[in-house]
Regions:
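N-terminal metal-binding scaffold of metallo-dependent hydrolase/deaminase domains
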Residues: 2, 7-51
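Divalent metal-coordination and catalytic microenvironments
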Residues: 21, 35, 40, 62, ...
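Divalent metal-dependent hydrolysis catalytic cores, especially in the metallo-beta-lactamase
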Residues: 75, 91-120, 133-146, 173-184, ...
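Active-site loop-to-helix "anion-binding N-cap" substructures in soluble metabolic enzymes
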Residues: 79-84, 96, 106, 110-116, ...
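Charged helix-capping and loop-helix junction motifs
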Residues: 86-89, 120-123, 162, 240-246
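Divalent metal-binding pocket/active-site signature
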Residues: 140, 147-163, 168-244
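Residue-level detector of conserved catalytic or cofactor/ligand-binding positions
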Residues: 270-278
């Protein structure tokens, strides 16, 4: 039941008010409050659940009210893959995610050929130009990876960083916002430094990097780790010597950010607990 009590605001704009839900705020969960929205923007989050006069009410009883998800690593959706590179595939995949709480998205390509990347970039730029588009840019997961850590990548597309490829590509396109690579590869430090100078997020992924590699990579611009724990080694031994793996090395750098596939399968629940500790 909605409260019969109301409150008035001095405004002539169209308002939408979400009430009765459990609201996630930076200070924690807020029960029995409300969120006031106008023209797609949040005007107010309050612990008062009195209905605002003139506002369209949405009753969220039994539900959570949380910020929309920003999907930074996603390969497709709705039965379509961003590797297809077509507007039809992109629209179908993006629409699927928009139905499930995502509000912004970075379509992701696995290790691809340059023509495939160009096709996807062209489509991405078209979608970014649409009004109120949720597409914020293109994410390239590869193809400069360690072959031994290829995982689900396409092996024949994997190679060492090649400036004759990536420099022209970044000059021709304007939508690539993130590019993942294995920093121990020949040319990977030059690659990371260059793409960072162009405003592209350099991320460590599909790698066998040890601490010295990670430290140098961080210094030249690699500040993120792709699906942390996956396709990267932990602590290991070579002959009588022991070495920090990629995982421990990233933990040692407080300013590096990570992403995890938090399904309890790619990363065990206990590891998720460790990651989430302050």
């Amino acid at each position: 039941m909605l409260s019969k009590e109301t409150r008035k605001l001095k405004t002539h704009i169209m308002l939408t008010q979400i009430i009765n839900g459990k609201i996630l705020t930076p200070q924690g969960w807020l029960k029995d409050g409300s969120v006031l929205i106008s023209d797609g923007k949040i005007l107010e989050v309050t612990n008062c659940d009195l209905a605002v006069v003139g506002a369209t009410l949405i009753d969220a009883k039994g539900m959570y009210i949380v910020p929309g998800g920003v999907e930074i690593h996603v390969h497709g959706g709705g039965g379509r893959d961003f590797m297809e590179g077509t507007e039809e595939a992109f629209h179908a995949a993006v629409a699927t995610h928009m139905k499930h709480g995502t509000t912004s998205i970075f379509p992701t390509l696995s290790s691809s050929t340059i023509p495939m990347i160009r096709a996807a970039a062209e489509t991405t730029e078209k979608l970014m130009a649409e009004k109120d588009s949720p597409v914020l840019g293109l994410h390239l997961e590869g193809h400069y990876f360690n072959m031994k850590m290829a995982g689900g990548q396409i092996p024949e597309n994997i190679k060492n960083p090649d400036p004759e490829e990536y420099i022209p590509l970044l000059e021709e396109t304007h939508c690539i916002k993130r590019w993942d690579a294995a920093p121990e590869l020949p040319g990977a430090m030059q690659f990371g430094k260059y793409i960072t100078s162009k405003g592209v997020l350099a991320s460590v992924g599909h790698t066998q990097a040890e601490f010295e590699d990670i430290l140098t990579a961080y210094e030249v611009g690699y500040t993120h780790a792709t699906h942390f724990y996956n396709a990267m080694p932990g602590f290991h031994k070579r002959r009588e010597y022991k070495y920090e793996g990629t995982v421990e090395s990233i933990y040692l750098l407080d300013d590096m950010t990570v992403e995890v596939v938090a399904d309890g399968i790619h990363v065990p629940p206990l590891s998720l607990i460790h990651i989430s500790e302050p």
